[in-house]
Amino acid sequence: MESRMDQYEIMEQVGRGAFGAAILVNHKIERKKYVLKKIRLARQTERCRKSAHQEMALIARLQHPYIVEFKEAWVEKGCYVCIVTGYCEGGDMDELMKKLNGTYFPEEKLLKWFAQLVLAVDYLHSNYVLHRDLKCSNIFLTKDQDIRLGDFGLAKTLKEDDLTSSVVGTPNYMCPELLTDIPYGFKSDIWSLGCCMYEMAAHRPAFKAFDMAGLISKINRSSIGPLPACYSSSMKTLIKSMLRKSPEHRPTASEILKNPYLQPYVNQCRPLSDAPTPIRMPEKPLSTSRSNQRCTSESQSSSISCSDIDSTQSSDRSTSGGAPSTDSKLNDIRSIQDADRADSDEKCVTPEDLRGNKNISGAELKRQDSSKSVHQHHRGESKQPKIIEKIMTTLREESRLRENNSPVSSSGVKLTSAVSNKNQAEQSSESSRPHSGVSYSSKFGDISSNGWTNTSDECVDPVQVPLQLKQLSPTVEHCPKLKNSGSSTPEPAKQIAENGSSASGMSKTKSSPSSSRRPSPQRQTVAGIPIVPFTVSKRAHIKAESEKTPPRPAHSPNNSLHNLPPLIPISTNLSEENIKLGNSQAMPAPLEFVTAASKEDISFYSNSVVDCVEKAEPSEVFESNSPAYLTPPWTGPVLDAKGENGLIAIPCSEIHTGTLQKSMASNDDSSLSSPLDTFYLSFEQEFVCKDDSQSSKHGHSAVTLLSGEDKFTVQELLASTPVISPFVSSTSNTLPEDKSSYQSFKKQSDSHSGPPVDVPAQTIRLNSFLVSDEWPTSETVQGEARDTAASKLLNVVREDFDVRSSSCSTSTQPSGQTPVRSKLNVPETNLASNISIPSISEAVRLSTAMDVKPYTSEASNGVKEEASPAKEALDVTSFRQRAEALEGLLELSADLLENNRLEELAIVLQPFGKNKVSPRETAIWLARSFKGMMNEEGGRLSM
């Protein structure tokens, strides 16, 4: 049988989109150029396959002067979807703007294009089609510079006044209601059209930021820059009216066409579209083709469109040539249906989707959330971090999903909680967890890696749905996923429940098998304060899981903690606490603990071990194969962020500011300053480990908190004295078998007492030399926040890889050893820590081991940095990361040149050059290291 491809002569590839290649072809008989969009189904995920079929069927029934011309479509050999559209010689709008190099379009031309675009969008909306991916790279130009709107790969058919909720499109063009997970409708296309018109006028995106958090913030505030002064105020007002935050305040496409300022251009363009051009509906196979199209398009893309990867290239290019006859297109559609039936198994689509039963149409998949619309605006702010995580994760996982080619199994309903932990995220394909008000279809949704289940839904004619299809159809009840639920079982403030209702307040959420199997940590309390273990997992374990861990609030409404990973107890008010000690010592500052344990085994990396810290206070810190437990022998009222508890609970599955921020008692950024300040401080001061009876010198660990990428690494700094077992021991014998109480624990710890030893502390420096295998970023040191009472800056200790390996070996101890407890009498000159980071409101100066006096630092006046988004993996192709690296290198080079430090400047610039391969991580590492040294020298000179 002769293939339809034989009718075309392949000329060249003109673009590559999200789902396939765009090839310029020449029709052998017509001698006319077309664009062939060829999508190989075998290499696509189920989502991409459905999108290909949806685009093929949808564009076949669209006919408008300002929409790409449809020639024909078919399934080639059961494994390719071929869509032939007209070729646009003028390219796309994005390419044209780049060629102009900053020269603005005349206002008359912009308004003409605007009128053509609005006419096309009005045609789509009047036929209940939502484009969902309006952007400049999808606006094509003919040889006569007329508009053709294309790329319907994400389009969706909606019932009138209906809404959808799938997160699709290009982030810069997404509307606020989509980003806040509020169901959206046709007004989302109006927002995207406003973004396009702004970009066409200003030659820059309406909303642009270096990270997703900044972009979403600008979109939610509708914060746009001024348009060029060469345009009239009427045009500016028209563009801004489409970029209003509330969908109700945006005009519809038909209302824009009635705008008096645009009327002359609409009348000029309307003669081409005066004749009514309804959507083409074949007579005989009406129910078959439409049910086929709608059923195959029920599951629209529920992740970010990949078409913005190659936004300057497109697979939809068209001209205004004549369309084939209705009979030929009827045959095309029939052939498409036949091929779909023959290859239904190859495409991994249900038979109901492809066979087009006459009593079942896409109208039957009725949405359950159409009544829940913009009244849910109150959920927006609390859901924003999860939306950020969702968008960033789906962007990263898009290519991986296509490569794996693993459609979601239809054997059972798969649900994941929006606030599942990383173990739950790993087993999301196996667990089945009820969610109040939400039912997902495993056949029509993709489960993203961060535990969020995306579904796509469609609202069309209300027809009775058979039970079999109802089980497959996605229905989403949009309930606030972060609402406070009073139905959680209250617990005493002294205990932390490992299993129970999650801190997000979602009622009736079962724990996954992984969390139910995990042993509960020991619960110990002293003076009504819960003590929580803190473990730092090895980087190798965290690397693949950190992106999967969604943010979670730490406190439930009844002020108890539920279902939390290992946490750090941190006192929050160092200068106001009234410490009452039972051993009649002078009043020291409250202790702070940092300990680390390997999660899977006792093998430590040198950058994943943190020694126990106690300031002038007898205590015992130990760990076993289970998470470590910390018990402070002090009492006194302590205020947390809400003034109720003495702890700030910080999950440690990935230690960075983004996770810390999201795991506090509130999702509100304004409540983070006090608890986070103290948390930073606990890592950036030098600590002393002391006991009444025995002391020994051991390796100190400096934890450097980096504000740039919001991550920290740990350096093992070893003393020159004989090697002694580290303070953090891996023995399981020190853990009480019955996990009883603090008294039994302290009684056991007192059995290891010995004679005290006075040793000088080894001074350490918080620097930028990192042991981590991930690329570093510089920490911000504010000179004005340094305390003049401190004697000097901490000295530089630089470890080579031999020392790191030895520290790694010494940090790993065989089981059966008891922890070593030390007493350090350290001179004030070596202990004064005067390093201050922005957002730190308090600092602690350690005067002696017996007399530690807290004081309030001047750092509260420092500039508070905006919370950074969740940590991203190293990506040398990321424009934001490359921009930050370039800025740091330029700043460093300028400083070196100004100080006439040419040798160091030569070292910094050595990896760069025409004939050199310059690994960015190496160059950045050098830049941060030298910059940190310069900051230290500047601090010494200023004293």
Curated annotation (Swiss-Prot):
Residues 8-262 form the Protein kinase domain. GO terms for biological process: cortical microtubule organization; microtubule-based process. GO terms for cellular component: cortical microtubule. Residues 295-315, 500-519, 805-819 have a biased composition (Low complexity). Residues 272-447, 478-565, 728-759, 804-824 are annotated as: Disordered. The active site is at D133 (proton acceptor). Belongs to the protein kinase superfamily. NEK Ser/Thr protein kinase family. NIMA subfamily. May be involved in plant development processes. This is Serine/threonine-protein kinase Nek4. The lineage of its organism: Eukaryota, Viridiplantae, Streptophyta, Embryophyta, Tracheophyta.
